From Swiss-Prot:
Gene label: chordc1
Family matches, as Pfam families: CHORD, CS
Location of the CHORD domain: 5-64, 156-215
Purpose of the protein: Regulates centrosome duplication.
Protein name per the record: Cysteine and histidine-rich domain-containing protein 1
Binding site for Zn(2+) 3: 156, 161, 175, 215
The organism of origin for this protein: Xenopus laevis (African clawed frog)
Length: 334
């Protein structure tokens, strides 16, 4: 009877009688997610694509392991008797909440239909070096050889499938994969197409696919694709900075255009990924004194405030649509 190996990066089924010291290729480390990069603590290889991360070949050989790692136990929060006694001594009274006055919005707010102007791009030396290295290593990232044939050992690109190409017979196998995307939320890990959730990353990797199909050995080139990207903002009295954590952005394809109250952002990074964002600004900016800084790890959009003041938020809240007025004729009263 075959058993399932729970070593990180393996997930294969094996025969216990043939389990030797070099049967399993796995990762002894732990998964590391940092600045949109994914990898293992025991390896130096990093990638931004989750399916590529799952297909990273292990760096250590050993025996297969069929022992499922225990899931972390969440500590229970208990209320002691001392806390209950202290709560009884608290004075009971009605709290009076005083709210600060709402900020006064500008009366003469410029129209959002004003002409847009592209902001100045400032390219850092670190980004130039990173782009030069990427151009030199483009040939090393191809999966197929010059004849167009799939190489032995190529991993299936379907999410959740850990099979590798072993020859023409691999094309006849049924691929069990996840058609959705991985979701990490509040310590839980799962696929959007399944309801099975776990807090252990190793268990998440071994979740069997919920969809049957054929293996995908090479990715289809769909050109530029719009993807989400982590971003945030902070402010000083003089300006607002929007940070977009996109690595290796391409200056010739990326731009930011703005007028006094609207900003349109397009960042092309990692060769084929595009981040787009339209922001209706809460305040008013000086377009001529605003600019964009491109570095190897992120893009920073500096917006010079037209007035030295604190913004309540970055975006102007959308006004709720007014309810349709009903034309009713009042009844005549005698």
């Amino acid at each position: 009877m075959s058993l399932l190996c729970y070593n990180r990066g393996c997930g294969q089924r094996y025969d216990p009688e043939g389990n030797s010291d070099d049967s399993c290729t796995y990762h002894p480390g732990v998964p590391v997610f940092h600045d949109a990069l994914k990898g293992w603590s025991c390896c130096k290889r990093r990638t931004t694509d989750f399916s590529d991360f799952l297909s990273i070949v292990g760096c250590t050989k050993g025996q297969h392991n069929n022992e499922k790692p225990p899931e972390p136990v969440k500590p229970e929060v208990k209320i002691t008797s001392d806390k209950k006694e202290l709560a009884d001594f608290k004075p009971k009274f009605n709290e009076l909440i005083i709210q600060a006055p709402k900020p006064i919005e500008c009366i003469n707010r410029p129209s959002s239909d004003e002409p847009m102007a592209k902001l100045q791009l400032k390219i850092s030396a670190s980004l130039k070096q990173a782009l030069d290295k990427l151009k030199l290593s483009e040939n090393d990232k191809t999966v197929t050889d010059e004849s167009g044939e799939i190489k032995i050992g190529t991993s299936c690109k379907n999410g959740g499938c850990l099979k590798t190409f072993a020859g023409p017979q691999s094309n006849e196998e049924v691929c069990h994969y996840h058609s959705g995307v991985p979701i990490f939320h509040e310590g839980m890990k799962y696929w959007s197409c399944c309801r099975r959730k776990t807090s252990d990353f190793n268990t998440f990797l071994s979740l069997e696919g919920c969809t049957k199909g054929t293996h995908l050995w090479t990715k289809k080139d769909d050109g530029k694709k719009v993807v989400p990207c982590r971003h945030d903002w902070h402010q000083t009295g003089a300006g607002v900075t929007i940070s977009i954590y996109a690595k290796n952005s391409m200056p010739e394809l990326s731009y930011v255009e703005a007028n006094s109250t609207v900003v349109n952002i397009q960042v092309v990074f990692e060769g084929e990924k595009t981040f787009q964002q339209n922001v209706q600004l809460w305040g008013v900016i000086d377009v001529a004194k605003s600019y964009v800084s491109l570095t190897a790890t992120k893009v920073e959009v500096f917006l010079k405030k037209a007035e030295f003041m604190t913004w309540a938020r970055l975006e102007l809240p959308q006004k709720a649509p007014a309810p349709s007025e009903q034309n009713e004729t009042p009844e005549e009263q005698e």
